[in-house]
């Protein structure tokens, strides 16, 4: 087992295919499927980000109940600086609340107007809603809101509002072997719903292996049994961020967390042995 782990360490790598502010597509090469799934789970559930934990409502003359407002406000993504704040359970204040683990936002608005996330005023200029144009409620004439919201770090394992990514999925990239017995009948080209194959100069070839979903329609359609699909240790990931952190930062933090957890497990095993 140790030898297999060393082989994976030596060959495992990531290739970025597509990257923008909110989305990254990449290939994870030569990794066990257990690691690929751990990576996915860590990005979604273990990387901490800021979100509103609770609100104090001083005045609400709108048509919406306080708890409905709290729910909407809690789901607003907030820009996060992990190097400046602690998780409540790791803070010197013991989770009671201090500038090292929480930030307060104030909202004081009067209708008629649509209240947006950008109307909140933060105690910390660098910690604010990731988007200013998220609508919260429409106030009519005479209606008013006075609210203080307190944000802290948390993880998606605790609540979905702390998830730094929305889409975080991977699929296995197969190895597709077209044997010499192929008679180039085009049956696989017509059967494949994703356009993986093409007839090039009278010969069937793989055009886009990354689009393959391993639905096996090509194998079923081939009367010559000339197509063989084999699972590999390569995975195509698609990750979309919510806005609190850059997606690449989420990836890096997730890998750090996996390493820390692996180190903790090694220590526990050594103690038992």
Predicted regions and their residues:
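Protein-protein interaction/assembly regions in multi-subunit complexes
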Residues: 1-273
């Amino acid at each position: 087992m140790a030898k297999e782990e060393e082989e994976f360490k030596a060959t495992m790598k990531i290739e970025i295919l597509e990257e923008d502010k909110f989305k990254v597509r990449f290939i994870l090469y030569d990794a066990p499927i257990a690691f690929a799934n751990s990576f996915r789970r860590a990005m979604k559930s273990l990387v901490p980000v800021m979100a509103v934990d609770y609100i104090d409502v001083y005045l609400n003359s709108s048509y919406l109940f306080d708890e409905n407002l709290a729910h909407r406000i809690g789901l607003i993504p907030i820009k996060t600086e992990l190097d400046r704040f602690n998780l409540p359970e790791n803070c010197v204040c013991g989770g009671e609340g201090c500038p090292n683990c929480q930030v307060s936002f104030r909202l004081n608005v009067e209708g008629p107007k649509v209240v947006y996330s950008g109307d909140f005023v933060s105690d910390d200029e660098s910690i604010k809603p990731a988007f200013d144009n998220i609508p919260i409620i429409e106030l009519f004439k005479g209606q008013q809101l006075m609210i203080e919201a307190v944000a802290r770090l948390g993880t998606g394992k605790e609540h979905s509002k702390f998830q730094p990514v929305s889409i975080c999925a991977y699929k296995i990239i197969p190895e597709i072997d077209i044997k010499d017995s192929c008679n180039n009948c085009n049956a696989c080209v017509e059967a494949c719903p994703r356009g993986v194959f093409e007839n090039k100069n009278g010969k069937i070839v793989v055009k886009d292996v990354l689009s393959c979903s391993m639905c096996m329609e090509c194998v079923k359609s081939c009367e010559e049994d000339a197509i063989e699909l084999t699972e590999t240790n390569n995975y195509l990931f698609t990750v979309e961020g919510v806005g609190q952190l850059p997606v690449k930062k989420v990836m890096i933090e997730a890998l750090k967390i996996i390493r820390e957890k692996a180190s903790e497990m090694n220590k526990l095993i050594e103690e038992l042995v």
